[in-house]
Swiss-Prot record:
Lineage start: Eukaryota, Metazoa, Ecdysozoa, Arthropoda, Hexapoda
SUPFAM superfamilies, A to Z: Family A G protein-coupled receptor-like
This protein's name: Probable G-protein coupled receptor Mth-like 1
Membrane-crossing segments per the record: 336-356, 366-386, 404-424, 442-462, 489-509, 541-561, 563-583
Record carries keyword Ubl conjugation: no
Glycosylation sites: 136, 165, 276, 486
Gene: mthl1
Entry keywords, A to Z: Cell membrane, Disulfide bond, G-protein coupled receptor, Glycoprotein, Membrane, Receptor, Signal, Transducer, Transmembrane, Transmembrane helix
Positions on the Extracellular side per record topology: 38-335, 387-403, 463-488, 562
Membrane topology listed for this record: Multi-pass membrane protein
PROSITE patterns associated with the record: G_PROTEIN_RECEP_F2_4
BP terms from Gene Ontology: actin-mediated cell contraction; cell surface receptor signaling pathway; determination of adult lifespan; G protein-coupled receptor signaling pathway; gastrulation; imaginal disc-derived wing morphogenesis; mesectoderm development; mesoderm migration involved in gastrulation
Cytoplasmic side: 357-365, 425-441, 510-540, 584-676
Amino acid sequence: MDRSRSSRAASSNQFIRPCGLLTTVILLQTLVSMSLAIEEMSPPPAAPPRPSPPPTVKLNKCCHSGEYLNDGTCIAGSEALWLPMVYLVQQQRFFEPHGASPRFLKFLPNTRPTCRKDQTTEIFRSRGANVMLFPNGTLYVRERALMVQPSDYCVDWEVAVVCLNDSQPINALEDPDYAANPLVQQEPPKASLRLSKCCGKWGSYNTQLQNCDLQPNHQAAVDGLLRLSPQLPEGSYQTSYGLPDCGQPGGYSIAGDWQDAKLDRNTAMLQLPHKNLSAGQYCLEHTQREGEVKIIACQHLFSSAAGAGIHDGSIGGTIEQANGQNLQKAVLTGGILVSIVFLSATLVAGFLLPAVHHALHWRCQICYVTCLLFGKILLAIEELSSSLQPGSAACHTLAITMQFFFLAAFFWLNTMCFNIWWTFRDFRPSSLERNQEALRRYLYSLYAWGGPLLITFVAACVDQLPETTLLRPGFGQLYCWFDNRNLSIFAYFYGPIGLLLCANIALFVSTTHQLTCGLWKRDDVKSSSEKSALGRVCLKLVVVMGVTWIADILSWLVGGPHGVWFFTDLINALQGVFIFIVVGCQPQVWTACRRIFCPRLRHDITNTTNGVQHSSSSQGLPSMAGGTEITQNTTTTTTTTNTTATHMPSNPAEDEVPEKAPIAPVAPIVKMETIC
């Protein structure tokens, strides 16, 4: 019975469940249909009321209709859209089109404010929203962060004439306490020096985003003023607000650090390394780093600035000075291009002599010329390319790559100078085994490639750190080079190069001393022709060891007008020409060229050269070692063969030096070649 009772209960439950679900669905459908019917019968909600137009406000126009204000004088002719920008507070937008007048603004023509005795008249430019109007007629001057009543100003095309009180109220838009207590007064300093803060009263410059950060900055959160101590004590200057009026497209750039600049307190002119900025051409701004202040200026002022070793002149010069600077820049750029051609020819000349490719000095020479060639090419691209913009990835990459190749060139130059000095250090016979020469080659490569790579890697890593007290190189910020800060460019470029050049000069002095005081006094060198040839060797060493590069370091350290260093800059720009004269203008090179381009002469040249001189040492390199054939195996055995064929000397100095009787090879015989 229990089992039958339970079975009946289960069957009844199975029947009740679907019936209950069906009933629920029917009820829901009924409720939905009733709610839709009610919504259709109810009237639509009322639209929000349109904001009532503001009351009519009368403002002063400085000149008559159809006239505009220019240097305090009304001149016929005006623009249709002449009004400063009007900000509609309720709609939170500017009235469009910009320059047009809303209907609620009425203007009294040819009406200027009457300033009281305790007021001064000042004219403000309205470009870049420096001046804007509010619907109640209040004028906001962003440059001074102040509000002006309609009776104290007049407006015209791109200008506003304002009567300024001795003490102006704090900006109501930017100071939250002003709304609660509008009687708060801001006492400006009495100093006449006025410096502009770029990003407004409470903003700062974000170096990562490369724009203004309008969030309150901890350095300006107190009063929104510039903090320029210890260079300028507080109270010795006034703070205005806004970016400079460029007048040309192109935006703004970081011109440098405030700590590296010199300020003329009388004129507010700012002197940067090789650049002067007048008071209206720059502004200052704090960054997120404690104590750091950047100088921001119009980018077009630096569009012609140079990269490594080439400096721009002052902006505030005459037209003749500007033309002279442009001419000097064009000449130097042309010198760089000419140097590129001759450096390429030098590489070709070096590869025309496969017999000397094993020489260690030849390898150092080729690496030096190659690095200098690539550095010059990148510098020419930076000078001539108009598509490279500071801040771009291409500009950043170009700056890092150019630093590496220039550093590598000077490291290889130092290696080559050491190799020259090592060869001439005591004029004693020295022979290197093949494994010893290979070891020196590996050590040279490790030093000359590893040093620049390490310096460039450290500079690139420091430049990408978000927060650090280390010196940032600032690649690609202002130029496609360093950001023109003295300490950073010294630490990562001029400092290492200066040390290498000092070492090169010491090696040059030691080498020339060995040539003049050592070889000159030997019995081998007595005639005046031999001594003059030896003097030409020393002259070539000046080019080889990069002695003239020291002038580029001095021009950076001393500074001054660009014309003072024009001659030395031109010599360094044409360095490739001088290197080609020393290396490419060798008789062996011309002989190789004739052998390649004149096949009929190959047989004659081979016959004549086979009967002249044979040496057990490696063939000398027509290198930059002052025209001297530098070999590592200097112990030689020389035999002379008389030939009836045309004499083709392997050493052109033999045409100058009188023939001598053979002497015992106690010391190496230094063969000198004449300059081209």
